[in-house]
C-alpha cells in the first residue's frame, strides 16, 4: 500500500468483510466506501493523507495508514484526513509529519511559513521523518545496492520522500517544490 495508486484503488473496489458469530458459522457482506463525495474524507484525500480502505464488520468506514498502521473510523462530513492524521500521529508516523503536517506550514497565499523551527525542511526532525518514508530501506530499492548514490539517507537529506507510483518504483518527491524524480542510477547523487 506504499503507492498512492494502490491506496486509491482500495477505495474503489468492493471489500468482503466477515462477522464471526460462532465457531461454526459466519456472515459476510460486501461493502464500498460509504460516504458521499461531499465529505472531506474522500478516496482522494484519504489516499493522499496516507490511508487505505480497511473496513470491518463493526467499522464500515475504517481506514489504516500504510506507514504507521493507525486505524481510524466513524468519519463525519467535516473531518479532514490530513488534520486528523497529523494530530493523532505526528509523534509516531513519518507520513503524518512530512505530508499531513505540511498544510500547517503554508499560508493562505501558498507561501511557506515555518513558525516552528522543527518544521523547517533542514531540521533533523524533518530529515528523520523523510527517511522514515523509505521504511528504513526496506521499500527503497537502491538501499540493497552497495554504494548506490541515491541511498535513502541521501534522498532524505536532499529533501525527498518516497512516493512510488507502483510497488517497487523508485519515484521520490520533494513536497516543498513538488518535483518528482525516478529512474535513479548508481552514480546519481540527490544532493
In which residue ranges do the predicted regions lie?
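Intrinsically disordered, low-complexity linker/tail regions enriched in polar/charged residues
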Residues: 1-191
